[in-house]
Amino acid sequence: MAVITAAMVGELRALTDAPMMECKKALTEADGDPVKAEEILRVKLGSKASKAATRVTAEGVVAAYVSGNVGALIEVNCETDFVTKNDDFLGFANTLVKLVAEKNPADVAALSALPLEGKTVEETRAALIGRIGENMSIRRFVRFETTGKLASYLHGTRIGVMVDFEGADEQVGKDVAMHIAAMKPVALSSDNVPADLIAKERSVAELKAAESNKPADIVAKMIEGSVQKYLKEVSLLNQSFVKNDKQTVEQMLKEAKSTVKSFTMFVVGEGIEKKQDDFAAEVAAQVAAAKQA
């Protein structure tokens, strides 16, 4: 049986907002596995127990660039929030996103090899690290080239959205991009939701329904109802439009004679686990070192 520490409980609580005792029970049941513990909390406490998708820990910025029918999004990471406000770091990210749009590199390695003001991008990055004194990396980027229109939205520098759409009204694209940043859909329509996410949601629904002790036919309906509710919540076209919750995004687009072809959203640090410093251990080590000196 794994030893459940206060730090483990605190970390799970930070991810889920669940009560401390529930977090400890879930970790005990999961034998210390935080991923399993989070799933257990979802079954016990409902979907509000999982906020991992919107709670990110790594630092950095998202930059966007649109020129006519070509555009790009990029995420550049650093170690601390302080550096995200540095003009040189921000300038580097904005230069890179324009370079992605103009040169269409295949991947981060190809982007890093491109020339930039007499150096390569990689050499420029290394020089910036030396100047600022903090590690930084190019995490990911996406490039758009469309026969329609592009709209981008940046929520500060932490969330970036690019939308490929068709329609006469430019504002529609901007509104959809802002909606995506706020509501964070995972797919354009329910048909596009990744199978692994549906399977995970169905598994949670099955466990919750099994605890109801209802007849099998009722349980089956409960499971299907939960899955359909999830699909509606995470697919863009089915979501209630953030600027008018009386209609869905699909209804708004139809009314505006517009269509969304695709979209991409980057959230800084999404999926990256940031090292947590153990300050108590650090102080203890410093005290021990001082005694030996």
Swiss-Prot record:
- What domain of life is recorded for the organism? Bacteria
Check the record and name the InterPro entries matching this protein. EF-Ts_dimer_sf, Transl_elong_EFTs/EF1B, Transl_elong_EFTs/EF1B_dimer, Transl_elong_Ts_CS, UBA-like_sf
Cited PROSITE patterns: EF_TS_2
What are the protein's UniProt keywords? Cytoplasm, Elongation factor, Protein biosynthesis
One MF term from GO for this chain?
A: translation elongation factor activity
Span list, region Involved in Mg(2+) ion dislocation from EF-Tu:
80-83
Q: Which Pfam families does this entry report, sorted A to Z?
A: EF_TS (PF00889)
Q: According to its record, what are the GO cellular component terms?
A: cytoplasm
| Cellular localization per UniProt | Cytoplasm
- Cited NCBIfam families: tsf
Q: Which family does it belong to?
A: Belongs to the EF-Ts family.
Name of protein:
Elongation factor Ts
Instruction: Show the taxonomic lineage.
Output: Bacteria, Pseudomonadati, Pseudomonadota, Betaproteobacteria, Burkholderiales
Gene label: tsf
